[in-house]
């Protein structure tokens, strides 16, 4: 019996299979690659952040972890709250189909309600569970949102410097990433530069406050001026096609006294993307959410679009176990004091050694001016002292580097002599 008989293929289908096989073999013989070249390029050119992190792991294996000062990755060293472990223990008593089974695509109803009620307590809002879509972390939140609010050929504005993966996700949605430089004195969002970047093709603006990589927290005044500019632009557009503001907020709870305004209360056409990677120190568990506020005029159409994007991109549901953890731990505080201590130790020393940096009001990153114009060359030289920093070019701004001070306090202190030696080379 032939394989075609076994598969019960008709003669027409057999001919089609043979034709496709012949075409593939011809292409293979010519050396043509039957793969997606864009995806190949993305995989071959890995994230510079991950590249440096991998290099750090190699060096730690070679010379000992205590001798490598890796500031590359935003990987919290602060432990998850004790309540997380207790919640996991409790969940392990559940029947297997509840613990490990699928949840509804938008998330467990009780988890969505817990998120909405937490936001209502904090911001005086009136959200419901149906306004929340649970996701596999902030990356999934952003990719789903971008695919929901844009069409191929649209433009999405980012504030430079910006998290490098924004460009990847924007371009995957078939859109063009347009950079609007921040104010280089304060690294506040520059409303004027955003206005200059807006065209008829602009579909969305992404903001990230507290900001990665600068640590800047956008003020209420800045956000109100941005909202007014967007409304002025929207007034000249089809009412069904306003510019959407995507507020990426994984660092919301990690602030040092600054106010982090609730963006949907300032601009109505806002979608919020969130992750528990930083606030609960759960970066590897991949759980977060999208909020489509019920005050957003496009909400009735936008939430189904988010669901459709998640389905199309292959996100079946957020992890069942950690949705249950979120229900129990949603209002657990972040250990901001640990990050504040790291920040003080690092900034005090770098200032003494002659480095220039942006005073961070939030997140756990320090944005430092390189001691030579080429930040890549500077970061390569830093490796001589086992100092691993991320050059700024991939963030859309040359001449700086990013340090993630979410490492242990011991790493900060032990790295300081190396930072001084490096600075001395440039004197």
Predicted regions and their residues:
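Conserved glycine-rich beta-strand-loop-beta hairpin in the small C-terminal domain of fold type I
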Residues: 320-327, 339-351, 357-369
């Amino acid at each position: 019996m032939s394989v075609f008989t076994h598969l019960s293929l008709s003669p027409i289908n057999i001919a089609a299979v043979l034709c496709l096989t012949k075409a593939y073999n011809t292409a293979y013989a010519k050396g043509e690659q039957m793969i997606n070249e864009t995806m190949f390029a993305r995989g071959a050119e890995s994230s510079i952040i991950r590249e440096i992190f991998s290099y750090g792991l190699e060096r730690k294996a070679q010379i000992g972890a205590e001798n490598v000062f890796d500031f590359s990755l935003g990987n919290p060293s602060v432990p998850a709250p004790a309540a997380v472990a207790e919640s996991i223990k409790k969940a392990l008593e559940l029947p297997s189909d509840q613990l490990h089974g699928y949840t509804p695509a938008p998330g467990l109803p009780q988890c969505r309600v817990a998120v909405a009620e937490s936001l209502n307590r904090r911001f005086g809002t009136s959200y419901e569970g149906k306004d929340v879509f649970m996701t596999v972390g902030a990356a999934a939140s952003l990719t789903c949102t971008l695919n929901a609010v844009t069409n191929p050929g649209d433009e999405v504005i980012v504030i430079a410097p910006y998290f490098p993966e924004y460009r990847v996700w924007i371009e995957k949605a078939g859109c063009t990433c347009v950079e609007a430089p921040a104010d280089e004195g304060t690294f506040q969002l520059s409303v004027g530069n955003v206005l200059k970047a807006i065209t008829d093709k602009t579909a969305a603006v992404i903001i990230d406050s507290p900001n990665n990589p600068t640590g800047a927290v956008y003020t209420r005044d800045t956000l109100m001026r941005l909202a007014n500019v967007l409304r002025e632009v929207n007034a000249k557009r089809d009412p069904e096609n306003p510019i959407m503001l995507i507020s990426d907020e994984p660092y919301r709870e990690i602030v040092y006294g600054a106010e982090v305004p609730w963006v949907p209360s300032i601009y109505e056409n806002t979608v919020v993307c969130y992750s528990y990677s930083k606030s609960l120190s759960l970066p590897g568990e991949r759980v977060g959410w999208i909020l489509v506020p019920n005050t957003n005029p496009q909400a009735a159409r936008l939430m189904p679009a988010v669901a459709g994007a998640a389905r199309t991109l292959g996100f079946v549901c957020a992890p069942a176990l950690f949705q249950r953890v979120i229900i129990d731990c949603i209002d657990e505080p972040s250990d901001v004091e640990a990050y504040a201590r790291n920040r003080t130790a690092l900034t005090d020393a770098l200032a003494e050694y002659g480095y220039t940096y942006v005073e961070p009001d939030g997140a756990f990153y320090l944005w430092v001016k390189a001691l030579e114009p080429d930040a890549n060359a500077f970061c390569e030289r830093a490796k001589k002292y086992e100092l691993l920093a991320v050059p700024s070019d991939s963030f859309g701004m040359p001449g700086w580097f990013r340090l993630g001070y979410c490492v242990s306090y011991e790493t900060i202190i032990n790295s300081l002599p190396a930072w001084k030696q490096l600075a001395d080379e440039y004197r």
